[in-house]
UniProtKB/Swiss-Prot annotation:
Ranges of residues in domain Radical SAM core: 42-265
GO CC terms of this entry: mitochondrion
Group of enzyme by EC: transferase
Residues that bind [4Fe-4S] cluster 1: 28, 33, 39, 276
Protein name: Lipoyl synthase, mitochondrial
Residue ranges, annotated region (Disordered): 291-318
Cofactor field: [4Fe-4S] cluster
One GO MF term: lipoate synthase activity
Catalytic activity: [[Fe-S] cluster scaffold protein carrying a second [4Fe-4S](2+) cluster] + N(6)-octanoyl-L-lysyl-[protein] + 2 oxidized [2Fe-2S]-[ferredoxin] + 2 S-adenosyl-L-methionine + 4 H(+) = [[Fe-S] cluster scaffold protein] + N(6)-[(R)-dihydrolipoyl]-L-lysyl-[protein] + 4 Fe(3+) + 2 hydrogen sulfide + 2 5'-deoxyadenosine + 2 L-methionine + 2 reduced [2Fe-2S]-[ferredoxin]
Cofactor note: Binds 2 [4Fe-4S] clusters per subunit. One cluster is coordinated with 3 cysteines and an exchangeable S-adenosyl-L-methionine.
Length: 318
């Protein structure tokens, strides 16, 4: 496994300074992501990427694996956040950005309108050039929230199933759930008329069996999910759920092949993979531009290019 480099470099410094100036949070920092330096720093021909966390740094839920702060009554939303986020990202000149958020069950719409406003402003300020992925909550099963996000004009709708069905209650907050998450993903695909790519993520090493992982992959595909990532759960602090198993690279490779055989459009599977990691960025961007009728090659040429990009993405996690 590749040793992760320490955060640093001009691009890393620029992004961190701008985030502090505009009082923005990132899931990269809050969740203590091991890939922070690599993604923020860019390099090796990759786009520097920071996953912006909307609606503050305090979540109303308390999942057993997550290092983000929790509270029953988080601070009010910052009404300037959508404008600040869109301003910062537009200034960085990125081609692809990931938005995520805390859960805000204290808000009537779960924060859907706030997220949607950010997406619309991003599209406006970049004249539609920017590709936007949003990793969003389940909105407590309210499909109105899902529709609000879809209609904002994003390109990739992401929501994480996190773990297998049997372990949902042990891993996630009691307000989350297997059926609710699958319904959210299915609704996003349906409301968009199939236009959106949908994406989800599974943590391994929580005590799941191989058969349960395969069943989870099948359930995601049955609900129209196009992209899946699989990564190793790492315990953020001693207060959090313990790691049940460190899954081998060979097992991750086997799950990747199984997912491909099930028909996922893109799979990133490896110990250091996280749901917002850049491993899929090249491939997903190519697919989205192809759907737009953009600059990509067609037919066999496009398939060959996408295959090369998948290999590059997998190499980033090796």
């Amino acid at each position: 496994m590749k040793r992760n480099k320490l955060p640093g470099g001009d691009k890393y410094t620029e992004i961190k300074a701008k985030l502090r100036e505009l009082k923005l949070s990132t899931v990269c920092e809050e969740a203590r992501c091991p890939n922070l330096g690599e993604c923020w720093g860019g390099g090796d021909g990759h786009t520097a990427t920071a996953t912006i966390m909307l609606m503050g740094d305090t979540c109303t839920r308390g999942c057993k694996f997550c290092a983000v702060k929790t509270s029953k009554a988080p601070p009010p939303l910052d009404p300037h956040e959508p404008e600040n986020v869109s301003k910062a990202i537009a200034a960085w000149g990125l081609d692809y950005v990931v938005l995520t958020s805390v859960d805000r069950d204290d808000l009537p719409d779960g924060g859907a309108a706030h997220i949607a406003s950010t997406i619309r402003l991003l599209k406006q300020k970049t004249e539609g050039r920017l590709l936007v992925e949003a990793l969003v909550p389940d909105f407590q099963g309210d499909m109105g929230g899902v529709q609000t996000i879809v209609e904002a004009g994003l390109d990739v709708y992401a929501h994480n199933i996190e773990t297998v069905e049997r372990l949902q209650g042990q891993v996630r907050d009691r307000r989350a759930g297997w059926a609710q998450s699958l319904a959210t993903l299915s609704a996003a695909k349906r409301v968009s008329g199939g236009r959106l790519l949908t994406k989800s993520s599974i943590m391994l090493g929580c005590g799941e069996s191989r058969e349960e992982v395969v069943d989870t992959l099948k359930a995601l595909r049955a609900n129209g999910v196009d992209v899946v990532t699989l990564g190793q759960y790492m315990r953020p602090t001693k207060k959090h759920m313990a790691v049940a198993e460190f899954v081998t690279p060979e097992a991750f490779a086997a799950y990747e092949q199984i997912a491909k055989d099930l028909g996922f459009l893109y799979v990133a599977s490896g110990p250091m993979v996280r749901s917002s990691y850049r491993a899929g960025e090249l491939y997903i961007t190519n697919v989205l531009k192809g759907r737009r009728g953009g600059e990509g090659e067609g037919g066999e040429g496009q398939q060959q290019q996408q295959g090369q990009q998948q290999q590059q993405a997998r190499a980033a996690t090796a």
